[in-house]
Regions:
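Signature of N-terminal electron-transfer/Fe-S-associated modules in redox systems
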Residues: 1-121
């Protein structure tokens, strides 16, 4: 769960030397949340019970954000591949994959991440 966005790509902060981040844009899950960049992912995770203890959630959200930035409509296999290396002992991953797939569909339909800051009707 040590994932951050480094110049738009998800990287493990715990495996990245500070010199490698020199001059780069670094975004944490908190920064992505405050900017509403992942609001739709957070809502979808909540709606689909894609989190339980929450330990893996920051890494899953950063990974999903990076994936959907690179590829608007990834297949379920591509989602699973992107998530490899992020371990969840609680959910079995299907709800996480479902949530990411749902966000990809919503974004393809023209909804934005910020749309999900509003409470559901």
């Amino acid at each position: 769960a040590c994932l951050v966005m480094l110049d738009g790509a998800p990287v493990h902060a715990c495996l990245t030397f500070a010199v490698q981040a020199g001059g780069a844009a670094v975004e944490t899950v908190e920064g992505l949340s405050e900017s509403a960049a992942i609001a739709d992912l957070q809502r979808a995770f909540h709606e689909r019970n894609a989190l339980q203890c929450g330990f893996c959630t920051p890494g899953m959200l950063v990974t999903a954000h990076g994936l959907l930035t690179r590829k608007a409509m990834p297949s379920r296999e591509e989602i699973r591949d992107a998530l490899s290396g992020n371990y969840c002992r609680c959910t079995g991953y299907e709800a996480i994959v479902d949530a990411i797939e749902a966000v990809a569909r919503r974004r393809a339909a023209g909804e934005t991440a910020a749309t999900f800051l509003e409470e559901p009707a």
